[in-house]
């Protein structure tokens, strides 16, 4: 009986060409595994394609609920955003995929796991760190990093497939490199490789329209949260995955969440991408608005630092680490009272606040009002400012003393 390898399979040209290459190079029995994180119609016809390409079996595993609840929610609660813009759509999905690949490999008794990530990108790191953390005994094969992988173009891959009896309708024309899941869709390549060029949004966008093509009338949306977890949209209770789908629909219609960024990859190079994250952008903003009411300043300050750190940890593929667990534990402790309702208006790329309520709100109208109230005596500010400004006053007095000595 041949040894088995589990291939992370998308159905695209790269992973299709890898199937005969694995059989030819290693004489493995190839088990394809496609992890559904919300790719949609990209999954159509995969079973036939995998078998025509020489795979002995195909698993299609739906992890949309796990992805949304176990990976997206913790990042939303933390406010994890990489380099101030990127909402981690691809990075958040990779640990769940790695976990499922390991599960299938264990089930099949496979000796290796193979992925089709290139040697220039972040995904090779994310997949392999996840596999190392969960299954250090399983071999990882990365064809793009091997000398005996000779295919350096789409044309070469198509010819290789045809030579091995695989004649599938893959086009040779260049197109955007895309990654789609429940949370977002990313675009790289073509004109985006030149930072001086404006993206061709008419051909690029899939989930969204540009703000200038959005409706001229705004749309109000209401969301509820319980302990930092979204529970409903416009009064309708839903699973987190369905909330994201609905927010994608609403946000995409109004041009929300289109970003064009140059980011620093883990491997050291800069890359440019356009990301569509309409639902994610809305969800992050709504959660932030609720936290403004419910969290004290000191907690918010530390939580912001932890959110930035978590973004880096997730981006670098270090999900299965004690550090991620510790950060997540802290963040979860801050969410105990992040419960309430957030209302906002979507209008031409903008999310406009329209009211926030919470039974745990720390906002006190009697304290914040400019009128006289019983809870706050304006005279109390005298002593506070004296003590709060004492370090500044002491330093200024010392500088004045030194200046006087110098002049005398």
UniProtKB/Swiss-Prot annotation:
What EC number(s) has UniProt assigned to this enzyme? 6.3.4.5
Question: Which keywords does UniProt give here?
Answer: Amino-acid biosynthesis, Arginine biosynthesis, ATP-binding, Cytoplasm, Ligase, Nucleotide-binding
Please classify the protein's predominant subcellular localization into one broad category.
cytoplasm
Q: Where does L-aspartate bind?
A: 118, 122-123
InterPro entries this protein is in?
A: Arginosuc_syn_C, Arginosuc_syn_N, Arginosuc_synth, Arginosuc_synth_CS, Arginosuc_synth_type_1_subfam, AS_cat/multimer_dom_body, Rossmann-like_a/b/a_fold
Biological pathway = Amino-acid biosynthesis; L-arginine biosynthesis; L-arginine from L-ornithine and carbamoyl phosphate: step 2/3
Q: How does it assemble?
A: Homotetramer.
Q: Which family does it belong to?
A: Belongs to the argininosuccinate synthase family. Type 1 subfamily.
- Name the chain's protein: Argininosuccinate synthase
Quick one: which gene encodes this? argG
């Amino acid at each position: 009986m041949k040894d088995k390898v589990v291939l992370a399979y998308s159905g695209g040209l790269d992973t299709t060409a890898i199937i005969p290459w694995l059989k030819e190079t290693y004489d493995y029995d190839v088990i394809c595994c496609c992890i559904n994180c919300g790719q949609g119609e990209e999954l159509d016809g995969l079973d036939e394609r995998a078998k025509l390409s020489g795979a002995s079996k195909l698993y299609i595993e739906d992890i949309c609920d796990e992805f949304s609840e176990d990976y997206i929610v913790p990042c939303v609660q933390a406010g994890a955003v990489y380099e101030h813009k990127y909402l981690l759509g691809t990075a958040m999905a990779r640990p769940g995929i790695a976990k499922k690949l390991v599960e299938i490999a264990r089930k099949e008794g496979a000796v290796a796991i193979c992925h089709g990530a290139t040697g220039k990108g972040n995904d090779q790191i994310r997949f392999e760190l996840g596999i190392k953390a969960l299954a250090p005994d399983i071999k990882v094969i990365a064809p793009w990093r091997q000398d005996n992988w000779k295919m350096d173009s789409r044309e070469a891959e198509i010819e290789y497939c045809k030579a091995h009896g695989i004649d599938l309708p893959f086009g040779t024309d260049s197109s955007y490199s895309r990654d789609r899941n429940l949370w977002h869709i990313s675009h790289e390549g073509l004109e985006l490789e030149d930072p001086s060029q404006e993206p061709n949004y008419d051909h690029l966008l899939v989930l969204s329209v540009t703000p200038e093509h959005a409706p001229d009338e705004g749309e109000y949306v209401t969301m509820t949260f319980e302990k930092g977890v979204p529970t409903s949209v416009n009064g309708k209770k839903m699973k987190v995955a369905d909330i994201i789908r609905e927010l994608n629909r609403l946000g995409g219609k109004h041009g929300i969440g289109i970003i064009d960024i140059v980011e620093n990859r883990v491997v050291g190079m800069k890359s440019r991408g356009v990301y569509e994250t309409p639902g994610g952008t809305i969800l992050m903003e709504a959660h932030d608005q609720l936290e403004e009411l419910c969290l004290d300043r000191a907690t918010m300050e530390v939580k912001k630092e932890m959110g930035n750190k978590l973004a880096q940890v997730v981006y670098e593929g270090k999900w299965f680490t004690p550090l991620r667990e510790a950060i997540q534990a802290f963040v979860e402790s801050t969410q105990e009272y992040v419960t309430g309702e957030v209302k906002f208006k979507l209008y031409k790329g903008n999310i406009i606040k329209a009211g926030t309520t919470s039974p745990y709100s720390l906002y006190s109208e009697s304290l914040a009002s400019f009128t006289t109230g019983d809870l706050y005596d304006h005279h109390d500010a005298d002593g506070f400012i004296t003590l709060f400004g004492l370090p500044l006053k002491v330093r200024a007095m010392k500088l004045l003393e030194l200046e006087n000595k110098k002049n005398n």
